[in-house]
From Swiss-Prot:
Name this protein carries in UniProt: Pelle-like serine/threonine-protein kinase pik-1
Listed Polar residues bias regions: 115-132
Pfam families per record: Death, Pkinase
Signal sequence, start to end: none
Organism: Caenorhabditis elegans
Active-site residues, as the UniProt record annotates them: D318 (proton acceptor)
GO biological process: cytokine-mediated signaling pathway; innate immune response; intracellular signal transduction; lipopolysaccharide-mediated signaling pathway; Toll signaling pathway
Name of the gene encoding the protein in the UniProt record: pik-1
Origin superkingdom: Eukaryota
GO cellular component: cytoplasm; nucleus; plasma membrane
Reactions catalysed, as given in the entry: L-seryl-[protein] + ATP = O-phospho-L-seryl-[protein] + ADP + H(+); L-threonyl-[protein] + ATP = O-phospho-L-threonyl-[protein] + ADP + H(+)
Length: 485
């Protein structure tokens, strides 16, 4: 039975049956057959071919990358079937027969029975070019990639054109350039992993040095919906980072929307994340109290900027120590904006119309109770998360730990506060990071007290009594440690 009867006419190449795609790529890789079809692929440029050659040097399939790039320009399994007809690769046509609609199967007979050019009745892919033109010049006529099309659609739906401005103001790079920058996304270049992607260290030409490349991976979700979600997160982060420039927000340098794996390029943060430094990973030296003060205030200012700049506040939605990054000067910068949303400020207790959201998937230990139970989304969600971060900075403890009798950090701090009151001692004597240098002088003691107090206030279960980010920063500044002269 021919199972192609129910096949949609528009199936992007990466979403065809995996085993069929692998068999096709194996044949195209043999004797570099893929190079013979590349000139017949509209939209494929010489630099794409060169990038595929470099990709093969990393023991990867060059034909798989070629097909992924071609798909990103708007070409489907139907176009691939027609390409094989045009280049008379009958074996590959038969191999992928089940992946295209039956009305195109007549092309196999055409190829078998004739050595002439395939009938003009076949649907022509947009922007067809000859092999000779590919050799002489870059092909400029091609369909927009699904990513670019989605970006364009989102831009048109945005009344302030923020996405269009973001894309126009940010350097586009090719997937091949990122492959070269990261040595083929080598495992040795991995500097971080998360639920939505992997971050690689790389050296990208034109950016002046080392960069961080975030590659949004599919995990176990290779569906079209999964691909769209990864694209949505990339576009959301691109729009936010390009729109909001601040000393404490991670700068974005470039982006790539080719293929099924969108990538964003950022400033490389040589001191890693706040989480890394609090846990002293890789043998790093514990943060001093002056550094903790500057990180707390700087990160607070960055988050406060998002909440207060513009008519509509930006809610980050995933504030945690892993998403506060530290540059070579230990200056904090907030990153990972893939989950952020426009939202509501909740400055008054009588706020009656908070945004109800179901798409924020922030780390559970940092999520406010009103979001967990009712999906209520206001700026106070970020305030709650930041309160947890401040308690981590004070104590060096994780936001959640199975090894503690009281697993949640807020509850753990409250237990210690009650214990300190019973012993008639300051809570800082119990709730303090033992790895940090000893407190020196009243200023450092006062700052730690403030850190604990405002951390608990920010992480209050009642969102209506939580302070705003501007109030938190103001309070920390009043109780800050004078800089060392």
């Amino acid at each position: 039975m021919d199972d192609s009867l129910g096949v949609s006419e528009v199936v992007m190449i990466p979403f065809m049956k995996r085993e069929v795609l692998q068999q096709i790529c194996a044949i195209l890789d043999t004797d570099n057959t893929w190079e013979t079809i590349a000139p017949y692929m509209p939209g494929i440029e010489l630099r794409d071919v060169e990038g595929c050659k470099r990709y093969s040097s990393y023991n990867q399939s060059p034909s798989e990358l070629l097909l992924r790039i071609w798909s990103s320009k708007g070409y489907s399994t139907t176009h691939l079937y027609q390409l094989f007809a045009k280049t008379k690769l009958i074996r590959l046509m038969r191999m992928m027969r089940s992946q295209v609609h039956e009305k195109y199967h007549y092309l196999e007979n055409k190829v078998t029975n004739s050595t002439s050019r395939v009938s003009k009745q076949m649907v022509q892919p947009p922007g067809s070019q000859s092999a000779s033109r590919l050799k002489k010049t870059e092909i400029k006529e091609s369909s927009p990639s699904p990513a670019a099309a989605a970006a364009s659609q989102l831009s048109r739906s945005n009344t302030d054109d923020t996405l269009r401005v973001a894309i126009e103001g940010t350097l586009p790079v090719t997937y091949c350039e990122l492959l070269e920058a990261t040595n083929g996304f080598a495992v040795s270049n991995v500097i971080g992993k998360g639920g939505y992607g992997t971050v690689y260290k790389g050296e990208l030409k034109g950016t002046g040095g080392i960069v961080a490349v975030k590659r949004l991976h599919s995990g176990n979700d290779t569906s079209q919906n999964g691909s769209r979600e990864r694209l949505r997160q990339s576009l959301t982060e691109l729009r936010t980072l390009a729109r909001f420039r601040h000393d404490n927000i991670l700068p974005i340098y470039a982006y790539s929307l080719e293929g099924s794996e969108p990538c964003l390029v950022y400033q490389f943060m040589s001191n890693g994340s706040l989480e890394d430094r609090l846990l002293c990973r890789k043998g790093s030296v514990p943060l001093t109290w002056i550094q903790r003060k500057e990180i707390s205030i700087g990160a607070g200012r960055g988050l406060g900027f998002l909440h207060s700049f513009g008519k509509t506040p930006i809610i980050h939605g995933d504030i945690k120590t892993a998403n506060i990054l530290l540059d070579k000067h230990m200056e904090p910068k907030i990153g990972d904006f893939g989950l952020c949303r426009d939202g509501h400020v909740e400055a008054e207790a009588m706020e009656k119309h908070p945004l109800i959201a179901s798409h924020i998937k922030g780390t559970l230990a940092y999520l406010a109770p009103e979001f967990i139970t009712s999906k209520i989304l206001t700026t106070k969600l970020d305030v709650y998360s930041f309160g947890i971060v401040l308690l981590e900075i004070a104590s060096g403890q994780r936001a959640y730990s199975d090894s503690r009798e009281t697993r949640g950090l807020v509850e753990y701090c409250q237990v210690n506060k009650e214990l300190a009151a019973h012993r008639k001692i300051p809570v800082r004597e119990i709730f303090i990071d033992r790895r940090a240098p000893p407190l020196v002088g009243d200023e450092e003691k006062s700052f730690l007290d403030a850190l604990i107090e405002v951390g608990l206030a920010g992480a209050n279960n009642d969102r209506k009594v939580r302070p705003t980010m501007s109030q938190i920063v103001e309070y920390l500044c009043k109780n800050s440690i004078p800089p060392v002269v």
